[in-house]
Amino acid sequence: MGHKHIAIFNIPAHGHINPTLALTASLVKRGYRVTYPVTDEFVKAVEETGAEPLNYRSTLNIDPQQIRELMKNKKDMSQAPLMFIKEMEEVLPQLEALYENDKPDLILFDFMAMAGKLLAEKFGIEAVRLCSTYAQNEHFTFRSISEEFKIELTPEQEDALKNSNLPSFNFEDMFEPAKLNIVFMPRAFQPYGETFDERFSFVGPSLAKRKFQEKETPIISDSGRPVMLISLGTAFNAWPEFYHMCIEAFRDTKWQVIMAVGTTIDPESFDDIPENFSIHQRVPQLEILKKAELFITHGGMNSTMEGLNAGVPLVAVPQMPEQEITARRVEELGLGKHLQPEDTTAASLREAVSQTDGDPHVLKRIQDMQKHIKQAGGAEKAADEIEAFLAPAGVK
């Protein structure tokens, strides 16, 4: 094996970087030299894997308040292609400079980190695609089920792309499979999972202990109450009205409620916090899910997989189109309930929890999905697939 060099490219977002951390650690343990360009926020997380973080500047601002405004104003969403053109123009030269004299033997790139794909093409290096969400083929695409995923460039955006420093880039490339595609979910959760060929390896969630998220003081009390976790993730959480609904819905109930409200909301800003509530900006989600009996989530793929891996029924309140697909999938597979955000009230939250909590059919489906997740193999299976690809038959 020697000390072959693997480079991992991603975007600066927890929902994309977190699924890769256990895989990164596994590759390092197997003797590979792994480099991972990240922004300042993720340096510590990458260092904990044993990989070498390389610093770069990004134009993407994953600010929850701005994201909420974007989601409310669909017209602003049409600016997304320009944001990605700007990001690739900013990032690609930095990556070229970082790797010009230190070319990797293999590149792994998140499906949204298109600069990684372009760099692989420029250097003539084989690349493996990482899917932190659904895989797509002729039977299942985001675009076929939601108009919001169809990317049609305006004349202004077409001009911006033509005048950019990017090689012949096409936004449709984001949906094109590579020779090997690592998908961080079990095949049983993927719509039309049986139709995906040998290029797709469904490894399930790649989970690792996250020291960078640990808290010194325990969050879960020994009150004996069942634990409910409420979290809308790290990017789509600027929704104070939702948290007030949760307080109204579960005040003085049997639940010990742990609620993560994100970094744009001050936990002290809530008046009259019930005795059975604990409110924080961030929580060690994996640790809490080990003891939780119910998870109210935004339906992000990371959170969904973490909840299912821990055997926790879900109530999903999606904040964007991809999460809407996941929330529907959770309900159709009998793993929990789906609430439309615009219809969410304290009463509907109570009702969804009441229908999910302790339901033997839901618990059975959850246990079945846990088995699928375990059988998928996680980070070690992903590393096995990458090693096989890197062997002489794959990368010369």
UniProtKB/Swiss-Prot annotation:
Which residues are listed for UDP binding in this entry? N18, T234, V283, H298, N302, S303, T304, M305, E306
- Look up keyword Transferase and say if it applies: yes
* Entry's EC annotation: 2.4.1.384
Q: What chemistry does it catalyse, as a reaction equation?
A: an NDP-glycose + an acceptor = a glycosylated acceptor + NDP
Biological process terms from the Gene Ontology for this record are:
antibiotic biosynthetic process
> What general EC class does the enzyme of this chain belong to?
transferase
User: Which GO molecular function entries does the Swiss-Prot or TrEMBL record give?
Assistant: hexosyltransferase activity; UDP-glycosyltransferase activity
In biotech or industrial settings, the protein's use is given as:
Such glycosyltransferases with substrate flexibility and less regioselectivity can be utilized for glucosylation of a broad range of pharmacologically and industrially important compounds. Glycosylation is an efficient tool for generating biologically potent and diverse novel natural and unnatural product glycoside compounds with enhanced drug efficacy. For instance, generation of novel resveratrol glycosides could facilitate the development of drugs to treat oxidative- stress-induced diseases and to provide antiaging functions.
Keywords, ordered alphabetically? Glycosyltransferase, Transferase
Instruction: Determine the domain of life of the protein's source.
Output: Bacteria
Its biological function? Glycosyltransferase that can glycosylate a wide range of substrates, including various flavonoids (flavones, flavonols, flavanones, flavanols, chalcones), isoflavonoids and stilbenes, to produce multiple glycosylated products. It can accept diverse nucleotide diphosphate-D/L-sugars as donors, including ADP-, GDP-, CDP-, TDP- or UDP-alpha-D-glucose, and catalyzes O-, N-, or S-glycosylation. In vitro, catalyzes the glycosylation of, among others, apigenin, 3-hydroxyflavone, phloretin or resveratrol, resulting in multiple glucosylated products, along with mono-, di-, tri- and tetraglucosides.
Family the entry assigns: Belongs to the UDP-glycosyltransferase family.
Q: What is this protein called?
A: NDP-glycosyltransferase YjiC
